[in-house]
Amino acid sequence: METDFYTQTDKISDGSSGNLTEQNINQSIPEENEVAELSKKGYALIKENKIDEAKNAFKTILEKDENNNYALVGLGDAERKQNRFNDAADYYSRCLASHPGNNYALFGLADCYKAMNQYHKAIDIWEQYLIHDDKNITVLTHVADAYRKIRDFKKSKQLYLRVLDMEAENAYALIGLGHLHYDFKEYRDALYYWAKMLEVNEAAVDIRVLTSIGNCHRKLKTFDKGVYYFERALQMDERNFYALFGLADCYRGMNQQFRSIEYWNKILELDPKNKVILTRTGDAYRNMGDYVTAADYYNRALNIEYDLYAVLGLALISKGEGRYEEAIISLSRLIQTDRKNHRLYIDLADCYIKTNRKAEAVDILQDFQKLGLRSSAVTEMLEKISA
């Protein structure tokens, strides 16, 4: 088929061209060349991170052709590079209004919606893209990721598996499936996909794969296996928060409090005002019977800001030292601020039992049940008291 240009010149030769003349066509050729050069320059400037200069180049094109698809997509890309996603989305939308189905505009617009956490809109756009290219692995994994973000397990998994049918060892699909199953608390399945990722890339493994495998073992309470992967991660980065946290928590789970303290304190060397870690360290010292040091860590956490678990830790120290009335007052206050925490009711009931107030212990446990909540620990304690 002839190009538009040759079709137009044929019309000129037979006198059917209307206002077109050979002269104005000759004038349009340099203009087209100028637009092409400006477009090429704009994209090169984006690659060099000279965003403002790139925008100027694309805007010059729009002065000549307000609907030029290269310029509109280029401006969208430039705005997106500066994290101005609303402005970028406007340019991509303008392009699509004049050039429906432009793949670059579709991809850019979907990426903007994803960045703005508007996952449903991103999915709609990507599915339009897939009409034109339903085997694009990058887009398929993006759509699967978006479905995962809106917690549509079935559609997300279907798309990840579709990618694996096309490319059995695709890293994005394997990692995505790992995250998907982990998010839905299916830790064994998550472990399978992350282990597969490790197997595929053993020589150059990403540290996040190691910590993810370790986290699955933490959740499955196979703490000794988790230790191995967190230690491997630390060999890659001795300051990695997730590896240090994972090791501390695994040793806590194995009841090796002295080892967990070692890693909690390593985190505190890097982040001394982390109140969650201060409280965890306090818990470890308390479980070892070192109430003085434990209280110091809890108070350090509370000096940063209020923390329920630090207050609970101090209440449990009072209980551990036989100061039951103090513990009862603290635990009763905590229940007022966190009525659904079954642990508070159990500790308070235990204080009542220790002070020979069995009826009050039963009452407080029944108060929890009246909330319509279920806890096997509360039920078992109530049955034991009532027996």
PLM features: what roles do these ranges have?
Residues 64, 98, 132-133, 166, ...:
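Structural marker of alpha-solenoid helical repeat scaffolds
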